[in-house]
Amino acid sequence: TYKPHKPQHIAENVLNRKFQADYNAMEVLLTDVTEFKYGVHSKAYLSAILDYGENKIVAYKLSRHNNNALVRDTVTQIKDTIIPMKTLFHSDRGFQYTSHGFKNFVEEHKIIQSMSRVGRCIDNGPMENFWGIIKEEMYRLTTYNTFEELEKDIEAYIEFYNTKRVTLKMGLRIPA
C-alpha cells in the first residue's frame, strides 16, 4: 500500500536514463525495494543494489519490514567498495532514499546521488527490469508458505542471476 510522505531530501536525476553507455564496476548503482507475498497474508520486502556496469546484484536484504533500516543494511554491505566522487547511486524517491539518514550516508561516502523523477519508474528501468525478471522466473509459479522458504529461493536466484543467467546487456555471455 502506498503511503504518501514528505521527502526530507531530493536529488536531481543525474543518471537521466543513460542506460546505453558503458560503465565500469561500481560506477553506476541502481537500487529499489520490492514486495513479495508469502503465507496467507504476510509480506516481505527485498532491497537490492544492481551494479549496472557489471549487471550484477552487489547487495540485497530481505526483511519483514519496509523501513529505513532495510535500505541502510543493504547499502552498508557495499560501503567499502564505493569509489568516492565517482560512484553514482540512483533510486526512486521512496521514503528511504529521501531521508536525512540516507543523505548523510551518501555525503559521508562521497557518493553522487541521483533520483528518478516523480512518477517516472522508467528512470530506474534496469532495476525495475530486474524486479520483473526475478518475479517471473523465480516467484510467479511458486507458493511460499514461510519467510525462510522465500529467503532461500531469493538467495539462490540472485546467485544464479549473477553467475549463470545470460543477458542481452552482457552480449549474451554468461557473467564472469
Question: What positions do the PLM features span?
Answer:
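RNase H-like polynucleotidyl transferase catalytic core
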Residues: 1, 89-93, 107-126, 142-147
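Short small-residue beta-strand/loop micro-motif enriched in glycine and branched aliphatics
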Residues: 54-60, 113-116, 140-141
